[in-house]
A protein has these predicted regions:
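A glycine- and small/hydrophobic-rich beta-loop-beta segment
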Residues: 53, 62-63, 67, 186-191
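Glycine-rich phosphate/nucleotide-binding loop
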Residues: 60-160
Length: 191
């Protein structure tokens, strides 16, 4: 199911699925690779590739744009998602989605961050970008909202003074959220 879901997702995106495994070391992954190859034949219009986890980590750092949809098992997915979060500024910047056939859950990659709960230090960007992902997933009728929020986040982050503690700044959770809300209001009133 996961391979088929990855290929279906690629039809809505740039049209490429990358299988990440370590089938040269872990024999159980050869089965996963075989299933991937079988499913890829059902989606001739989608480019597919298979790479090992160590190469995937290198490419994610050096050439992140080469990826569109990555399908892998949980262990490697956890490692790659944390690496990707680091590339965009940290866990406070990384949205997350668990997407099923009919339902989906969207949340920040960092979870609830209980170690800083109630201190006003959490970066709200991951939660806000998770909302963008949800609106994208919901479809065309919510696309304008997703774009508006995404652009507001980009506008706020373009100002180097807008940084929360995790990014070396001093803005609180509320201050960062308020800055993004102000950018949304400014953008939507100008349209």
């Amino acid at each position: 199911r996961i391979c088929r879901a990855a290929f279906r997702e690629a039809t809505r995106r740039r049209g490429k699925v990358t299988l990440v495994d370590k089938s040269n070391i872990l024999p159980s992954m050869a089965f996963f690779r075989r299933i991937f190859d079988e499913i890829s034949e059902e989606f001739n219009e989608i480019e597919s590739e298979r790479i090992y986890i160590d190469a995937a980590a290198l490419y994610l750092v050096k050439q992140p744009g080469r990826f569109d949809v990555i399908v892998t098992e949980n262990l490697f997915g956890d490692i790659l998602s944390d690496l990707a979060a680091g590339l965009v500024g940290g866990m406070g910047m990384a949205p997350s989605a668990d997407i099923g056939e009919k339902h989906a859950v969207f949340q920040p990659s960092h979870g609830s961050a209980p170690d800083i709960a109630g201190q006003g230090m959490a970066n709200p960007v991951a939660a806000i970008l998770s909302t963008v992902m949800m609106l994208d997933w919901l479809g065309a009728e919510t696309q304008r909202g997703a774009t508006l929020i995404q652009e507001a986040v980009q506008t706020v982050l373009a100002d180097s003074g807008n940084r929360t503690h995790d990014l070396g700044g001093s803005l609180s959770t509320t201050e960062m959220g308020d800055a993004i809300i102000a950018a949304i209001k400014s953008s939507s009133s100008g349209q």
